[in-house]
């Protein structure tokens, strides 16, 4: 029998380990999305001026808000949900309900569209890591 999709090994994904209590949504608590937001911040903080999880806007089990200032000094409020990340405001802690911005699967994709300086910083960091690996491989 042939299928049109590729099977996914869920054991490599966080929270889907065999026997894990987090399989499905039972047992998850309201801090899960906030923890995810904190991980997003830690991942790309090196490539922006400022980025932090909002303390003013409410976090829930299905949504968290992240404030980011790009190297170009543009400020955004981002919404993080199961659908991904999207811009919901153009100032810290600001949600503009009328905005219909697209969702991005990753913070990298979103910042890549917002900030050429992010793209450059990310590329430079990647190049430095590759050069370090090359040096380590030659020793």
Swiss-Prot record:
InterPro entries: GSKIP, GSKIP_dom, GSKIP_dom_sf. It is found in: Cytoplasm; Nucleus. One of its GO terms (cellular component) is cytoplasm. One of its GO terms (biological process) is positive regulation of canonical Wnt signaling pathway. Residues 115-139 are annotated as: Interaction with GSK3B and acts as a GSK3B inhibitor. The keyword Manganese does not apply. Forms a complex composed of PRKAR2A or PRKAR2B, GSK3B and GSKIP through GSKIP interaction; facilitates PKA-induced phosphorylation of GSK3B leading to GSK3B inactivation; recruits DNM1L through GSK3B for PKA-mediated phosphorylation of DNM1L; promotes beta-catenin degradation through GSK3B-induced phosphorylation of beta-catenin; stabilizes beta-catenin and enhances Wnt-induced signaling through PKA-induced phosphorylation of beta-catenin. Interacts with GSK3B; induces GSK3B-mediated phosphorylation of GSKIP and inhibits GSK3B kinase activity. One of its GO terms (molecular function) is protein kinase inhibitor activity. Keywords: Cytoplasm, Nucleus. This is GSK3B-interacting protein. Belongs to the GSKIP family. The record marks 130 as: Required for GSK3B interaction. Pfam families: GSKIP_dom. Phosphorylated by GSK3B. Residues 41-45 are annotated as: Required for PRKAR2A interaction. A-kinase anchoring protein for GSK3B and PKA that regulates or facilitates their kinase activity towards their targets. The ternary complex enhances Wnt-induced signaling by facilitating the GSK3B- and PKA-induced phosphorylation of beta-catenin leading to beta-catenin degradation and stabilization respectively. Upon cAMP activation, the ternary complex contributes to neuroprotection against oxidative stress-induced apoptosis by facilitating the PKA-induced phosphorylation of DML1 and PKA-induced inactivation of GSK3B.
């Amino acid at each position: 029998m042939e299928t049109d999709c590729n099977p996914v090994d869920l054991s490599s994904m966080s929270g889907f380990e065999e026997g894990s209590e987090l399989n499905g949504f039972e047992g998850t608590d309201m801090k899960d999305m906030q923890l995810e937001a904190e991980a997003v911040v830690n991942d790309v903080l090196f490539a922006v001026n400022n980025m932090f999880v909002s303390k003013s806007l409410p976090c829930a089990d299905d949504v968290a808000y992240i404030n980011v200032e790009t190297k170009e000094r543009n400020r955004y409020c981002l919404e993080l949900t199961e659908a991904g990340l999207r811009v919901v405001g153009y100032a810290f802690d600001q949600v503009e309900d009328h905005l219909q911005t697209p969702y991005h699967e990753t913070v990298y994709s979103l910042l890549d569209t917002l900030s050429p300086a992010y793209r450059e910083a990310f590329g430079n960091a990647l190049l430095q890591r590759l050069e370090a690996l090359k040096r380590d491989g030659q020793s």
